[in-house]
Amino acid sequence: MALPLKVLSRSMASAAKGDHGGAGANTWRLLTFVLALPGVALCSLNCWMHAGHHERPEFIPYHHLRIRTKPFAWGDGNHTLFHNPHVNPLPTGYEHP
């Protein structure tokens, strides 16, 4: 009685069938080349086309940001180590390039 149940249960297993997922691999390969790679290419193109269209936001001097209790040890003491004048404002506002 136990033998037919065991034979039936092993026939449901994928390892007993001998198929190692070749159809699943082909499906994922197709999805990668048809959907994923063109999607990444379109998103990259969109980012590249709109990269230079950003305007500098208005400076609002919040009292809890850019607090300088002592000067930095480099430069004039007011600029951070990796200061970028295009995007990083000083406590008084943006620098004019």
Swiss-Prot record:
Main location: mitochondrion
Result of knocking out the encoding gene: Knockout mice show significant decline of COX activity and assembly in skeletal muscle. In particular, complexes IV, IV(2) and III(2)IV(2), and supercomplex I(1)III(2)IV(1) are reduced, whereas levels of complexes I, II, and III are normal.
GO cellular component terms, A-Z: mitochondrial inner membrane; mitochondrion; respiratory chain complex IV
Bilayer topology: Single-pass membrane protein
Mitochondrial intermembrane-side positions: 47-97
UniProt KW Membrane keyword: yes
Keywords (A to Z) from UniProt: Membrane, Mitochondrion, Mitochondrion inner membrane, Oxidoreductase, Transit peptide, Transmembrane, Transmembrane helix
Positions on the Mitochondrial matrix side per record topology: 13-25
Intrachain S-S bonds: none
Pathway of action: Energy metabolism; oxidative phosphorylation
A Pfam match: COX6A
Entry superkingdom: Eukaryota
GO BP terms in the entry: oxidative phosphorylation
Residue interval of the organelle targeting sequence: 1-12
Assembly notes: Component of the cytochrome c oxidase (complex IV, CIV), a multisubunit enzyme composed of 14 subunits. The complex is composed of a catalytic core of 3 subunits MT-CO1, MT-CO2 and MT-CO3, encoded in the mitochondrial DNA, and 11 supernumerary subunits COX4I, COX5A, COX5B, COX6A, COX6B, COX6C, COX7A, COX7B, COX7C, COX8 and NDUFA4, which are encoded in the nuclear genome.
Name listed for the protein in its UniProt record: Cytochrome c oxidase subunit 6A2, mitochondrial
Organism: Mus musculus (Mouse)
